[in-house]
Amino acid sequence: HRDFHVSNMMFYKNKIALIDSQDAVLGNPAYDLASLIDDVRIKTSNSFKSNILKVFLSKFKYKNESQFINDFEILSVLRNLKIIGIFTRLAKRDKKRKYLKLIPYAWKLIDNRIKNNPNFHDLKNFLQKNPRIKKI
């Protein structure tokens, strides 16, 4: 879907309906889940995020659950790095500074995903050695 987040969902006749789907594409289902669980605009606890992931995995049986979780974490990190770039561009080019306040939480979401996944070793080292966007 690529634009899958709580703001694009609504209840209609006791079911969840998706809106704003004109840019929908087929892709890894872990991307949409990452968009829902690690939404930079909605702060939730890590335990809440873990519970959502557990419920999702209990409903949809994946042959390789650990691969799905790895995909989920990678896609969450990629998505939030992209969001940081987009919010920075909006502030610099378009003078839309209201999104800058969300950047620290995007970094927190990234940190939460990379801290225990060995596949992020190089990224973790890179981020430790290089300054993060904090102020524009």
Model-derived regions, located:
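Conserved short-loop catalytic and cofactor-binding motifs
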Residues: S21, I37-V40, F72
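Active-site acidic catalytic loop and adjacent metal/ATP-binding pocket
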Residues: H1-L33, K43
